[in-house]
């Protein structure tokens, strides 16, 4: 059976408190979307890894579990605070999942942040970029979603990430961002089921939301 691994890396730093409610709702909607995809495409096993991070922790809420084994997250699961060790979160997340997958597996990595790297200790930009470039040669697709106060295109380019989207850091913008991401996730899986690879740089094409 074909497997699709959904790695979702979400910033839990203090500044995310502005959109805490919408972020939590959006994460739950994403989990439900993956479950719906599993139902629509039973020939592809959907697995979920959900990682949140700030300067005090890198936490796996889900660690490579079946989509149907996920549950609705509560406010206890997402409590913004601290700084933004973005490189550590990405490096730790993709390195762990890489050890759990085979080269033929399909992996969709979604990175959501409202801030730039400022306190990583284990990984630097070069290390993360090299990891991403290596995994892109397999069936890994990387997406970066950031608030529009950031240079999202520049951040994505520095990490060798082809697909990126910016969104306003407010309730409406956050809600629409998750909607756009979920539509794109469904499209990605439909193309996989049909044996058509998603072209790099086209993940968010024609989806609601602001594409850089």
Feature map (PLM): residue ranges:
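Acidic, low-complexity intrinsically disordered regions
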Residues: 1-212
């Amino acid at each position: 059976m074909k497997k699709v691994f959904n790695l979702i890396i979400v910033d839990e730093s203090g500044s995310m408190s502005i959109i805490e409610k919408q972020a939590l709702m959006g994460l739950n909607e994403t989990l439900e979307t993956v479950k719906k995809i599993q139902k629509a495409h039973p020939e592809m096993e959907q697995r979920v890894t959900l990682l949140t991070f700030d300067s005090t922790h890198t936490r796996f809420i889900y660690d490579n579990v079946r989509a149907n084994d996920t549950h609705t997250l509560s406010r206890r699961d997402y409590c913004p605070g601290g700084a933004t060790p973005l490189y550590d979160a990405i490096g730790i997340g993709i390195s762990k999942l890489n050890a759990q997958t085979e080269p033929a597996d399909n992996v969709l990595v979604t990175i959501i942040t409202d801030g730039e790297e400022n306190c990583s200790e284990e990984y630097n930009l070069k290390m993360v970029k090299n990891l991403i470039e290596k995994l892109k040669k397999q069936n890994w697709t990387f997406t970066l979603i950031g608030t529009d106060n950031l240079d999202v295109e520049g951040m994505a380019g520095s990490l060798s990430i082809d697909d990126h989207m910016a969104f306003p850091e407010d309730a409406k913008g956050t809600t629409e961002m998750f909607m756009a991401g979920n539509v794109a996730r469904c499209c990605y899986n439909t193309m996989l089921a049909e044996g058509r690879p998603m072209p790099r740089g086209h993940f968010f094409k024609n989806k609601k939301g602001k594409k850089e």
